[in-house]
Amino acid sequence: MKRCGLKLTHDGGVAVLDGRDLVACIEMEKLTNNERYRRIEHTDEIALALHRSGFQPSDIDEYIIDGWDGEVDAWVELLGAAGRVQLKVAPYVEKEPDRANEFTQGFGLNILGRDYTYKSAPHVMGHIASVYCTSPFAIFKQKALCLVWDGSIWPRLYEISDGGIRFINTLFPMIGHAYACAGHHFGPYKNADRTSWKLDLAGKLMSYMSTGTVDSRITAAIQTSYQNNLAGHSPNALSYRRMSANTSVALIQTHRFFEEIGVLVAGAPEHDILATFHYFVERLLIETLRHELARAGRNMSRNLCISGGCGLNIKWNSALRSSGLFRDVWVSPFPNDSGSAIGAACSALVANDGLVPINWSVFSGPHLVKSTPDANWRGSACELSELAALLADGEPVVFLAGRAELGPRALGARSILAPASDRSMKDRLNAAKQREYFRPVAPICLEDRAPEIFEPGSNDRYMLYDHKVREGWRDRVPAIMHLDGSARVQTIARTSAHPVAKLLVEYEKLTNIPLLCNTSANALGRGFFPDVASACTWGRIAKVWAENVLWSNDVDARIP
């Protein structure tokens, strides 16, 4: 059975499951230097993504479209051969608590002139299916809890077991977009717009909050506003909770929440307000989960899956993992909507086969497209050992290898790599990427040596937790250390067949340092570079490596 999952709205993507094997997931932003978060605009793009994955539209046995905004049913719009069409899809959240995987049936998906029927699962179900079916819990047929916290919903807790998927409770009445909304009121990204948000804002704020300090006076003000506007018994709070499925109402009330905070702590440093808000929500997550576990007793699983856009918050993930509440915590490398096409396909798999694991690799994105840079760039043969020597001499390199990563993190296939031993390298990379000074640069590290350098230094292959840099290494690898002494670590086995692992081994031989700086290889506001020519046209790093060829441009004025 070949299933094709489709995410038509922002973070558009096309995923193909052949039986239980993930063949590919093609995210629109990772094609032709598209804008980040790009939706699927035309059904021809579905055909193109399938072609890149080795399929024709007629090869697919079942199409599944991700659900979207709507209390009962929802509609998504896209262009086709006959013009603009609206497709009926499932709502964002399941209609009934015990029917998480109930499908909406549809027709009229026209691809290359042929109509296909489809079905659609609730958006939240896609998050549940994608995270559980990729987890170690599924492999060992273990029960698990699943925390789903996405932009437009409150954090929702489910239990996954042989009996299926059971909704337990919402943890507290705050939408995931509250994090981005905070940035409209405080900090360097303030914006008077109260009707929308930028999808990249939450990640930037997570970096900026490390410049602030948690303040007890601000905590008290946040608690007061939280009760007055979201969780308490005031008319505004009660009305907000009654209309929780209305995204416009939720957004308006969330902004009122921050407006009152601003009044209560007028004059307080804004980076402290943001840092305190972050910690306030972190404690809410831990304490409400503690309450649910205590209420259920020993029968509730102590395995936790985290999904939804808030699953990209590495500090919350780390706090939950270290809380002592859970035996194990799993976050997939695509917890946000970049994994929704996979989730849609997995929803149909679960409906047919049960809660089974899929066979998958994080390197299942688009293949590197063959291209030739312009005449200003010179290509020469370059083995990984030679590239390691170049890095050891202090040069950053755009590193392109094989198929792209799934999800938003560059994990060594579409990366800019650089030595971490020079403190100025972080500033150099941030300048090349046109980013603010407080933005961190992550390390990619050989996993057997990670505990030597980081606390806890555990095996974290997808850059979804933060670690503290140990004192003895802070001066040896300063470029990967964030302002608060942390690092968003990605580990990789030295025995991995991936070229980036082999490069790290060669670099370690030369320097006795088992890590490099790793940041995404992309132009500002765009997805990963799809080919060498794109990286060279961007031109803000003078060296580009792919398939054992090093392309060099030592004279371009764009290079900072």
Swiss-Prot record:
GO terms for molecular function: transferase activity. Keywords: Nodulation, Transferase. It is an enzyme of class 2 (transferase). Signal peptide: none annotated. Its EC number is 2.1.3.-. Belongs to the NodU/CmcH family. This is Nodulation protein U. The gene is nodU.
